[in-house]
Amino acid sequence: MLNKKAEQERIEKAYPFLRAAECLGRNLLHAMLMQIPAETVKTIYTIANLGRDYVREDIWYIPYDPLQVIGARRSKLSASLDRPQEELIRELLEQDDLRRWITRGLHVLRIE
């Protein structure tokens, strides 16, 4: 029971992050208004798509750390991205840029 509760808490923590990423990725106008670089928007959208796969397919296994999402979905990521894009995603996540942009997007888009 505790395990299931802990997993549910992880889902609840991850979902707003994924929702924000999806909205920022799709809403290019807001991204432009926030001066988010185009390459970052593309990266956010890619990660949002990977994250949505977790919500839909693996409801009880959503890693909170986006790097784990990328690691767990390596084959899918490799199929959709070339090597430089994959390195860009890792670099953005490691530098915390992606989280900063998403936090800013949450504020601007008023997603709760």
Predicted ranges, named:
Residues 2-112:
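A charge-rich, low-complexity, intrinsically flexible signal that marks solvent-exposed coils, linkers
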